[in-house]
């Protein structure tokens, strides 16, 4: 059985076990974050079911945007687009940028990524097209704390 098959089977069992009215009538939980907050954080697997508990955040209380190294790489990248929706459509008033120790992005380099991409069959021409951007975000992250400070500075205005 593949990983996808395992996940689909678990999902089927999970849905069958749920209260049938849950999806349509759950008035306790809204798409609008009740604490009017958004968090930009890392996609690190160690943060799953950890970050929210450490901040006393429950289901429906915050919007959480995850990205490698909690990086915002440009004025209209996917993170910024998500934050714009959070602010202007979902009532978010505060944004928290949260990093963590031992972030893998601190050791990631454009050179290493390029080598691994080539080894997996990505065409050199395709890599060349994104080389400058990849160098900007992969080589620009050296320390989690510094990255949080830089991200906050870049988004304050």
Regions found by a protein language model. Give the residues of each.
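Divalent-metal-activated hydrolytic enzyme cores
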Residues: 1-35, 70-79, 87-92, 103-155
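Short Gly/aromatic-enriched secondary-structure transition segments
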Residues: 52-58
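Short, basic/glycine-rich phosphate-binding loops at helix/coil junctions
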Residues: 3, 58-67
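Gly/Ser/Thr-rich loops at beta-strand to alpha-helix junctions
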Residues: 43-46, 101-105
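N-terminal low-complexity or amphipathic/hydrophobic leaders
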Residues: 30-46
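Short glycine-/acidic-enriched loop or helix-start segments at secondary-structure transitions
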Residues: 48-51, 106-108
